[in-house]
């Protein structure tokens, strides 16, 4: 990179430092969670629009995702502060405490955030509590199993190497793909997307089933 590029990056870094200090850090973490969750939903909706001709972008859906993400930001901010005070650790010498933090995060924060996500979106979108709870029962274990596949390794890196003030920002940086998955899990349409009178990909149907049945009867 030319010297001018390095100077520009250093200037950008210096300008951004106040966002990660004092009370501004809480605002940064809160808005970061909301923006990344909305961006993940936007990416998912873009894919859905390509896969389903006629579907239009739903801005209210992304706004709901933004609101839920912002509501999670303060929790994550104080959650990591609490974990760091409870189990202080730095680098590989602190690995035992780091592993404790990863385990507690998976057993406490992850399921809590899953419940928060489904019930929060259900509330914002006008679902009844019974319907939201049923959706949570239907999808929670799928969410939680996927969570165990992704986040323990990510949090291990987070607690080992990332400075405390950047922990939520680091997580936000990784969550674009994860939030896209969460949007898919929340809004997916069950079953194959096939028009009436057709069948799933890989089979051939030349006439509707009712017509074939009528022919047999005749």
From Swiss-Prot:
Membrane topology classification: Multi-pass membrane protein
Tell me one GO biological process term. mitochondrial ribosome assembly
Q: Name one GO cellular component term.
A: cytoplasm
Q: Where is it mainly found?
A: membrane
Listed A to Z, the keywords are:
Membrane, Mitochondrion, Mitochondrion inner membrane, Transmembrane, Transmembrane helix
The record's annotation in InterPro entries points to: Mpv17_PMP22
Transmembrane regions: 20-42, 63-83, 102-122
Organism superkingdom: Eukaryota
Q: Where in the cell is it found?
A: Membrane; Mitochondrion inner membrane
The task this protein performs is described as: Required for the assembly and stability of the mitochondrial ribosome. Is a positive regulator of mitochondrial protein synthesis.
Cited PANTHER family: MPV17-LIKE PROTEIN 2, PEROXISOMAL MEMBRANE PROTEIN 2, PXMP2 MPV17
- Annotated family: Belongs to the peroxisomal membrane protein PXMP2/4 family.
Question: Quaternary structure?
Answer: Interacts with the large mitochondrial ribosomal subunit.
* Name of this chain's protein: Mpv17-like protein 2
């Amino acid at each position: 990179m030319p010297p001018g590029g390095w100077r520009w990056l250093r200037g950008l870094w210096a300008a951004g430092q106040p966002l990660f200090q004092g009370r501004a850090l809480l605002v940064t973490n809160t808005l970061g969670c909301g923006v990344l969750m909305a961006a993940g939903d936007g990416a998912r909706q873009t894919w859905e629009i390509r896969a389903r001709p006629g579907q239009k972008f739903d801005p209210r859906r992304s706004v709901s995702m933004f609101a839920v993400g912002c509501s999670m930001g303060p929790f994550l901010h104080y959650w990591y502060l609490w974990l760091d005070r409870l189990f202080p650790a730095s680098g590989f010498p602190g690995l035992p405490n780091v592993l404790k933090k990863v385990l507690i995060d998976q057993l406490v924060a992850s399921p809590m955030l899953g419940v928060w996500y489904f019930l929060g979106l259900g509330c914002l979108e006008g679902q009844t509590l019974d319907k939201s709870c049923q959706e949570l029962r239907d999808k929670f274990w799928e969410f939680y199993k996927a969570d165990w596949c992704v986040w323990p390794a990510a949090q291990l890196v987070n607690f080992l190497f990332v400075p405390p003030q950047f922990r939520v920002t680091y997580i936000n940086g990784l969550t674009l793909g994860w939030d896209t998955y969460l949007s898919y899990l929340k809004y997916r349409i069950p079953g194959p997307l096939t028009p009436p009178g057709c069948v799933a990909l890989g089979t051939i149907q030349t006439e509707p089933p009712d017509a074939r049945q009528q022919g047999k009867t005749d």
